[in-house]
């Protein structure tokens, strides 16, 4: 038989396969509604847990919270809401994501999510220990404690359903790189690549813990452009005139962030293959932040490499105080202090995640 005679049959076969796949997609049941959001990590998702521990890494004082409802200084390292607050509100879960250690949080509140995160912490427990904040191991212990409270309230079956359909957010790594590589005396002795690999191993272990606890929707944030954080711009230009004028990002640190994020995405792909029935996804924060830096006018921003608090060069936490001068219009600033994004920036990050990531969950 002529080889060309097989072509129509083969094409028909392919079309039938494609039609079957489309039919399966059409008939596939939609993902169950998201029941809750639980956050682990550092200041990017800490709703105020550090208010209840003895550490200098606190922001429960003005001018923090100046854009928050009632201008409350809740312990969030921003002028207002974090990305996780915008997300839980958009999902219809609650107005904002509370801190687990907040005494006002009741067992029923745990059913729709809380933050276990701690500003100053990291994937490497040594980071949190050096800043006297809550390690990832301790955050995990708090999560197990919360599970017990939930089971006492609604039983094992309902708790398991909540956990299975909840979104888990891990956002950490920036402090690890800054404290242990860039701004540490031992940094020159550490291979950046090797240290990144050690952090990713910790991510893998934590995700496995979540999976074994019943989590099936897990998102892991990559690193931001660390070299564009105002404090890093300042510290790497301390001896040059550009400390005040013509400030530019520290590109080798941004390069490190991009490499880490590539490694993280590779790890996440492997975890997705390994943990069948789960959705482990990469939460890209680098792209929206660098886009705001490169195209500020698109977002109504005017200042992207200085914070709103004080000089905007070094102030954060205890250095950003009630008497600190603040900018006239924080909505035009990408960063509120020298490290942490403003509410405006967090709103953009949340919108980016809700558009690009959450439809996949």
From Swiss-Prot:
Species of provenance: Arabidopsis thaliana
The keyword Lipid metabolism is annotated on this UniProt entry: yes
Protein name according to UniProt: GDSL esterase/lipase At2g40250
Family, as annotated: Belongs to the 'GDSL' lipolytic enzyme family.
SUPFAM superfamilies: SGNH hydrolase
Any Pfam family hit: Lipase_GDSL
Cellular localisation: Secreted
Major site of localization recorded for this protein: secreted
Gene Ontology CC, one term: extracellular region
Signal peptide feature range: 1-28
Any one GO biological process: lipid catabolic process
Keyword field: Hydrolase, Lipid degradation, Lipid metabolism, Secreted, Signal
Molecular function, one GO term: hydrolase activity, acting on ester bonds
Catalytic site: 43 (nucleophile), 337, 340
Enzyme Commission number(s) from the entry: 3.1.1.-
EC primary class: hydrolase
């Amino acid at each position: 038989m002529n080889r060309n005679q097989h072509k129509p049959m083969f094409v028909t076969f392919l079309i039938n396969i494609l039609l079957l796949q489309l039919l399966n997609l059409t008939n596939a049941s939609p993902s169950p509604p998201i029941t809750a959001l639980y956050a682990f990590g550092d200041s990017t998702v800490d709703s105020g847990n550090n208010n209840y521990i003895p550490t200098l890494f606190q922001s429960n004082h003005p001018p923090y919270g100046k854009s928050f409802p009632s201008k409350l200084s809740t312990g969030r390292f921003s002028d207002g809401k974090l990305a996780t607050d915008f997300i839980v509100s958009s999902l219809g879960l609650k107005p904002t994501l509370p801190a687990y250690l907040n005494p006002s949080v009741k067992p029923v509140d745990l059913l729709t999510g809380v933050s276990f995160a701690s500003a100053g912490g990291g994937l490497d427990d040594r980071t949190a220990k050096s800043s006297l904040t809550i390690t990832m191991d301790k955050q995990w212990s708090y999560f197990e404690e919360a599970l017990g409270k939930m089971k006492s309230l609604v039983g094992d079956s309902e708790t398991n359903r909540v956990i299975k359909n909840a979104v888990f957010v891990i956002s950490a790594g920036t402090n690890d790189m800054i404290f242990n590589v860039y701004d540490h005396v031992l940094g020159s002795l550490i291979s950046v690549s090797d240290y990144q690999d050690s952090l990713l191993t910790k991510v893998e272990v934590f995700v496995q813990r979540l999976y074994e606890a019943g989590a099936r929707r897990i998102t892991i944030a990559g690193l931001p452009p660390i070299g564009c954080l105002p404090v890093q711009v300042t510290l790497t230009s301390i001896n040059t005139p550009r400390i005040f004028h013509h400030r530019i990002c520290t590109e080798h640190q941004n390069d490190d962030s991009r490499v880490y994020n590539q490694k993280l995405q590779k790890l996440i792909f492997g975890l997705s293959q390994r943990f069948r029935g789960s959705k482990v996804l990469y939460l890209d924060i680098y792209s929206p932040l660098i886009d705001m830096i490169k195209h500020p006018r698109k977002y109504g921003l005017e200042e992207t490499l200085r914070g709103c608090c004080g000089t905007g060069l070094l102030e954060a936490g205890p250095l950003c105080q009630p008497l600190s001068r603040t900018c006239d219009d924080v909505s035009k600033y990408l960063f509120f202090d020298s490290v942490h994004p403003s509410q405006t920036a967090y709103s953009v990050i949340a919108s980016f995640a809700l558009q690009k990531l959450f439809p996949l969950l």
